[in-house]
Design a protein with these regions (language model features):
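Beta-rich nucleic-acid/ligand-interaction surfaces
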Residues: 54-56, 542, 851
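Extracellular/periplasmic, surface-exposed regions of secreted and cell-surface proteins
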Residues: 26-28, 44, 52, 66, ...
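A short beta-strand motif that forms part of the nucleic acid-binding face
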Residues: 114, 125, 139, 255-256, ...
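Outer-membrane beta-barrel transmembrane strand signature
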Residues: 189, 197-242, 247-253, 329-377, ...
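Conserved small-residue
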Residues: 134-215, 466, 581, 669, ...
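Short, small/polar-rich motifs associated with maturation and membrane association
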Residues: 1-274, 286-288, 292-294, 308, ...
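Short, glycine/acidic-rich beta->alpha junctions
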Residues: 82, 90, 101-104, 113-117, ...
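C-terminal beta-barrel architecture of Gram-negative outer-membrane proteins
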Residues: 839-901
């Protein structure tokens, strides 16, 4: 049986597109949240990791649909849609299964919340039989592995000197040979500290003739990355009790996770408690209740930078430090300011000591139900049941941050820099009430009819408060006594919002001879967030399935065990509009009002609306067609499914330009369309099966092609995204890197033409894609001419005539679209079992997406592979201070994010039952795993950047831009599972 919306079904009777992740899959991978368990194991689901402790990754089911509204799926925990809670609060060890509903015929049952897919999470319940106690504990050790080949201090000194020599600005006393006085001028500013003088003295030794011998290896190098990182250590413990009889069941669990990642100032703790109970006091009544409580503490050290510029954490700050800068004074104390060329860069070790950024979460998810079986009262009502679900979610968070005197001012306010404290509180509460009527009938063993009727109501509210203080009197008070600050406090802020939903739904499942299946669903949804007259809408769906293996002519083919064709169509909605957005928000402002003698003006506080109200704002709608085949052959040694889908989203929520005479520039409106088309394959093969040995492989492959079909006002381009009709939703639209200019006759001629047009390019610098230079005889129609100039700007007498095809303009015709989202993703899991031993390894891959992150200088450290006359195949440009065209150099940072990651290699041993009887245990297993042992890919991976890590990227655009070096963390996990 598998879980579907508002019920369960036999897997063979499912007509929609769905996938399942079981507790066995979760156990096989030591994950901290549910998303990690799904990565690469489910077709159509693209998940990227987030190595920051306690944080979720990013998830998309069958691509992006909306430009401005939410693209995240709906989570349903034990039948209750999640609004106030978070999937991060659910301990993965408490999860029995996760069903992922992907097409509209499956998700339309959730109406306005199903457009982005639905993930049904079922937690573990008590089981009938003997009472069991289980323990699962693991310890892991990890380290940050960077493959970036950075320059050491001596190499960086040579790099800077060569840059000045190439640019003709070195002017040393010994020609191009090292000159200590000139080198100091390259590195030091007039206000610099003396420690660099002492370090440079070791590099230069004066000879008897007054010249200097030079040994750059004597220049000390500080490994800043080593100083701010540590050996990661995580321990995770879970103990559970399961008991049950025919009339009652109970499941109780306690969990504890303590995670210390390689960054010294980041850690995460989570405490969870879960209880699920069910009693059957009579034959006609069943009552159940579940309560999941969690408390978590996250510490992230410095302020998280969510932009695409600047460091994101202490490691990013450390990588911005020059390698020649010492971390400590001679007396062993931390160096106060450790940057020679920019006093704003403080020693990141001080930041670790003087910065706290702690978030505490308290969460409760409550679910309950009561079910009446009317068939126990009266035989004609057999198969008729009434069920009431009541659920509530509460989440309270407190974010406290404190930045001491040694920390780089996070709020960019020099007048209020020291001892800054910030305190933010928020709480979210939601409740859901559902009444369901089930009617299940079988007629003459031929017809089966299952009817589900639903009435649902949901309410949500959130409120928050924040305050900030400067020059905190007692640093030890952190953010707990902001009122005692010596300086004027930042104006406190608060917020509040609430919304409600109401729904009515009907679903009919019909089966004919257990071969022909039909599912029809209709849901009528209302949402308070939308405008009057548009609050309610109807979302229908239908799906057909043909179980061909039940046909006699198929049963004659012995090697076919399962063959089911499915087709489904449905409409879902997305009402992800902020409350009150249809009415326009109001803020305070100052108005200048003339009055009195001489028309004197006075500033008076008034109010104004920020955005023009839209009283017709409605739903985004997605219509989806899905065609699928489920199959199993050779005694199900080979089984799987193939899916093809088209999803079209209309009435997108976008800001539309309006006449300024209205008093506003834009209005949020339902305009625009997008489309997703895709192909998915999941395959499970039992490659070898003998008495003692089994080899099984599970494959997933997903291809998604998303496009914008229409923008506001019929425009073909909108710079907001940027968005372009016919292109993916999340894209870069920019110039293209071609190669590095070479010192060849062909390149020199082309550079001469550019120089004569006012564009100076030099050998060893980046060449950007341009329209080709097509030289033609002078006077040719449609041609232009240019007089060639030499490097000094003097005319050489040579005239070049070329076609006016856009050459030398560098405009939109030279740009291209870079897709941030992958074109295809997948995973391969191989499992080898020999007697009581099991060895498995899981591979995850993503291809076809582009990143903006391949920088030659990550922070201020510079990679070695730079162009020179003897290294013409280099990865990066030649260093030079010469005047040249540099405004296009950034385009070199675009690179493919293709990657193949071996996520884990696991070895386990299950202790034989004959051994366990002697100690009274029912089960025992020991295991060891290696996480992220191998990462393969293109330039991005070779540069030491992990494309699977969200930490340093712009997550809002589902990966894309990055300036922080996000290395990969490799770990060894040791664990044991015991059952009694």
């Amino acid at each position: 049986m598998v879980v579907v919306g508002y019920g369960v079904q036999k897997k063979s009777d499912v007509t929609g597109a769905m996938a399942r992740v079981t507790s066995k899959v979760i156990e096989d991978r030591p994950v901290q949240n549910a998303l990690q368990a799904m990565q690469g194991r489910v077709t159509g689901v693209d998940i990227t990791s987030n190595n920051r402790p306690g944080e979720l990754g990013d998830i998309r089911i069958r691509g992006n649909r909306s430009l401005t509204a939410d693209n995240n799926p709906l989570y349903v925990i034990d039948g209750i849609p999640m609004s106030a809670g978070s999937i991060a609060d659910v301990n993965p060890s408490d999860i029995e299964s996760m069903e992922i509903l992907k097409d509209a015929s499956a998700t339309a049952i959730y109406g306005s919340r199903g457009a982005n897919g639905v993930i049904l999470v079922t937690t573990k319940k008590g089981k009938t039989g003997r009472t069991t106690i289980n323990y699962d504990g693991s310890f892991s050790f990890g380290f940050l592995d960077s493959t970036t080949d950075y320059m050491n201090s001596g190499q960086l000194l040579d790099y800077n000197r060569q840059s000045a020599i190439t640019g003709g600005t070195y002017n040393g006393r010994y020609g191009d040979n090292p000159d200590p006085e000139r080198d100091k001028a390259l590195w030091l500013n007039p206000n610099n500290m003396s420690y660099m003088d002492k370090r440079l003295e070791k590099v230069y030794q004066q000879n008897a003739d007054g010249t200097y011998s030079y040994d750059p290896s004597q220049l000390e190098t500080t490994d800043w990355g080593e100083l701010v990182t540590r050996t990661a250590f995580t321990h995770n413990h879970q103990i559970s009790l399961s008991a049950g009889t025919e009339t009652s069941k109970l499941y109780v669990s306690l969990g504890y996770l303590d995670q210390k990642v390689p960054m010294k100032d980041q850690d995460f703790k989570r405490y969870t408690a879960n209880i699920n109970g069910e009693i059957i006091p009579t034959k006609w009544l069943k009552v159940g209740m579940g309560l999941n409580a969690t408390h978590s503490i996250k510490n992230y050290g410095i302020v998280s930078n969510t932009s695409n510029t600047g460091a994101k954490d202490s490691y990013g700050l450390a990588m911005g430090m020059m390698p020649w800068v010492p971390a400590y004074n001679e007396d062993g104390s931390i160096l106060e300011v450790a940057s020679a060329d920019d006093q704003a860069y403080h020693n990141p070790l001080r930041n670790i000591d003087d910065a706290r950024n702690e978030t505490r979460y308290y969460g409760v998810n409550f679910s309950s139900y009561a079910e009446l079986d009317f068939g126990q009262f009266w035989e004609p009502l057999k198969g008729v049941k009434w069920r009431t679900n009541l659920g509530a979610q509460y989440r309270n968070s407190r974010v406290g941050s404190y930045y001491g005197e040694g920390y780089t001012n996070p709020f960019k306010n020099p007048a209020m820099a020291p001892n800054v404290a910030n305190n933010e509180h928020s709480q979210k509460l939601s409740w859901t009430l559902e009444n369901l009527l089930y009617i299940n009938k079988t007629i003459k063993d031929i017809h089966s009819v299952n009817i589900t009727l639903l009435q649902s109501a949901e309410r949500y509210r959130t409120e928050g408060l924040n305050m900030r203080g400067y020059e905190i009197t007692f640093p030890s008070s952190l953010w707990y006594n902001i009122g005692a600050s010596n300086n004027a406090k930042y104006a406190p802020g608060s917020n509040f919002s609430t919304w409600s939903r109401a729904s009515y739904m009907a679903r009919v499942n019909y089966g004919l001879m257990d071969k022909y299946l039909l599912t029809v669903t209709g849901r009528f949804d209302g949402a308070s967030m939308l405008a009057a007259g548009n609050k309610w809408d109807f979302f229908p769906s239908a799906a057909l399935a043909w179980r061909m293996e039940q046909e006699k002519w198929i049963q004659q083919i012995n090697w076919i065990n399962q063959l089911k064709l499915r087709v489904g169509y449905g409409v879902t909605g997305n009402s992800a509009v902020n409350p009150y957005q249809t009415a326009g928000s109001v803020t305070s402002t100052y108005a200048s009002i003339p009055f009195g003698v001489g028309n004197v003006s006075s500033n008076t506080i008034g109010t104004k609306t920020n955005i023009m109200p839209n009283y017709s704002l409605g739903w985004e709608k997605t219509s989806s067609l899905n065609v699928g085949v489920d199959f199993g052959v050779l005694e199900n040694r080979i089984s799987g499914s193939v899916e093809y889908y088209i999803a079209k989203t209309s009435d997108l929520l976008m800001n539309q330009s309006i006449p300024v005479i209205t008093g506003y520039a834009q209005i949020l409106n339902n305009v625009g369309k997008t489309e997703n088309r895709g192909f998915e394959v999941s395959l499970s093969t039992v490659n070898v099966k003998t008495k003692d040995f089994t080899w099984q492989t599970d494959w997933t492959f997903s291809l998604n092609n998303e496009k914008i079909k229409e923008l506001a006002g019929g425009a073909t381009y909108d710079s907001t995204g940027p968005w372009m009709v016919g292109e993916p939703l999340n894209s870069f639209y920019d110039f293209q890197y071609d190669r590095i200019w070479q010192n060849t006759q062909e390149d020199n001629h082309l550079m001469d033409v550019y120089r004569s047009l006012g564009l100076t390019f030099l050998p060893g610098q980046y060449k950007i894609v341009d329209q080709p230079l097509v030289e033609v005889p002078q006077g040719t129609e449609g041609s232009k001419t240019v007089e060639i100039k030499d490097a000094a700007g003097n005319k050489t007498g040579e005239v070049v005539s070329y076609m006016d095809n856009g050459f030398g303009k560098f405009d939109d015709n030279d740009k291209k679209i870079y897709n941030k989202s992958p074109k295809w993703t997948g995973g391969i899991n191989n499992s080898f079992t020999y007697k009581n031993w099991n060895l498995s390894f899981f591979t995850y891959f993503r291809f076809g997406n582009t990143y903006y992150g391949l920088t030659q200088t990550i922070g201020r450290r510079i990679e070695k592979d730079t162009w020179s006359p003897t290294n013409t195949d280099a990865k990066f440009a030649q260093p030079t201070t010469a005047t040249r065209e540099t405004k296009y150099d950034y385009v070199r940072n675009y690179t493919k994010g293709n990657m193949v990651l071996i996520k884990n290699i696991a070895l386990s041993y299950t202790v034989p039952q004959s051994w366990l009887k002697k100690c009274g245990a029912s089960s025992a297993q020991v295991y060891a795993q290696v996480l992220n042992p191998f990462l393969f890919g293109g330039e991005l991976v070779k540069a030491g950047i992990n494309p699977d890590d969200l930490t340093g990227w712009d997550a809002g655009n589902h990966i894309g831009g990055q300036t922080n070096n996000t290395c990969i963390t490799r770990s060894l996990v040791l664990g044991v599972r015991l059952g009694f």
